[in-house]
Every structure is written in C-alpha cells, then in structure tokens.
C-alpha cells in the first residue's frame, strides 16, 4: 500500500501510483460509425441464434459460436469480416488502424497497436460466447440465457452508450478509445 512517504519513493523510481477512476464509461452515440453498426449486427445474429436454438433446433447455436469466434479473431488480428463489408459500403470507422499520410486502405483493420478497453471487450465476450455456444449445443438450452442477454445488452450499448463490462474494465484501468468525456 502506498502511503505519503513511499509515494515519493515510487515516483522517483519511475512507478506512478494510479488514481482511482471516477465517472462512467459512455461511448460516442451522437454519430453512427462502423463499430456501432457491427455491434448491432452481432446482437441481431446472437438473438436470432438464441431464438432459433430454443424454438427450432439447438444446432442453431452455431450462429452464437460464429459471433464468438469472430469476436476473438477481431480482437487478436484487427480484421473484421462484417466491418469490411460496411467499410466497402462507405461507413466510416473510429478505431481504424492509422495509415501513412495520403494512403487509403481498401480493407478495414481495427487498431491493434496495444491492448485497450474495446479490444478487451471483444476478447472477453468472444471467449464467453464461444464456450456458451458449445454448452448450448451439448449440455442444456438453459445456457441460451447468456447469449440472449449479451445480444440484448449489446443493442442497449449501441443505442445508449452504456455497457456494464466496459464500465468494469474502465474502473480497472483499461484505456478507452471510444469514450466521451463526462
């Protein structure tokens, strides 16, 4: 624990104690951008997969697995299949990997220069959706509560800008890149 006496020692040694974050994490909702549209599409696929698995056949959990694996893939590589379709249709991204001056990319790649809050969300949600899809398929349909909740929460997140997981990571010190200052 840092006290007044050893705060100066820690600062002199190059370690700066972090202040506890206050406030809430809210994404930019005054404009529509590529990442928000990807979240809406993922939420629709999650809710459709949950509903079809529940009402028709539990093999529809493959839609949930697809969203989960895609989310993990995006967090690790920066390449998003749905994002690239939207990019080709002219939707502007916020988290696009920066290019050299004057360059124009024909592919959308999310920033992967370092781990930041939004990348953590892609990874955490992707892993949890992937194992949940397998549990839905091979164990019990009760596991559909989780992807249905994630789908509904993602719609709320995309429209209101508020996400429970994002706020938790924000409070833990993850660097936000889509946050508005409150």
Language-model regions, residue ranges each:
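Membrane-interfacial helix-loop segments of redox and metal-homeostasis proteins
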Residues: 2-182
């Amino acid at each position: 624990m840092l006290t007044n006496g050893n705060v100066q020692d820690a600062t002199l040694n190059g370690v700066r104690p972090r202040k506890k974050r206050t406030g809430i994490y809210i994404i930019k909702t005054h404009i529509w951008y590529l990442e928000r549209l990807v979240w809406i599409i993922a939420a629709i696929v999650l809710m459709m997969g949950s509903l079809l698995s529940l009402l028709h056949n539990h093999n529809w959990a493959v839609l949930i697995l697809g969203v989960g694996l895609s989310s993990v893939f995006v967090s690790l590589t920066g390449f998003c299949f749905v994002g690239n379709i939207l990019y080709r249709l002219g939707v502007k991204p916020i988290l696009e990997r920066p290019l050299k001056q004057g360059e124009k990319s024909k592919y959308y790649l999310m920033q992967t220069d370092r781990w930041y809050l939004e990348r953590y969300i892609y990874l955490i949600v992707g892993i949890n959706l992937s194992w949940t899809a397998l549990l839905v398929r091979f164990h019990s349909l009760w596991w559909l509560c989780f992807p249905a909740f994630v789908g509904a929460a993602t719609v709320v997140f995309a429209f209101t800008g508020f996400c429970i997981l994002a706020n938790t990571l924000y409070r833990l010190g993850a660097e936000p890149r889509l946050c508005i200052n409150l």
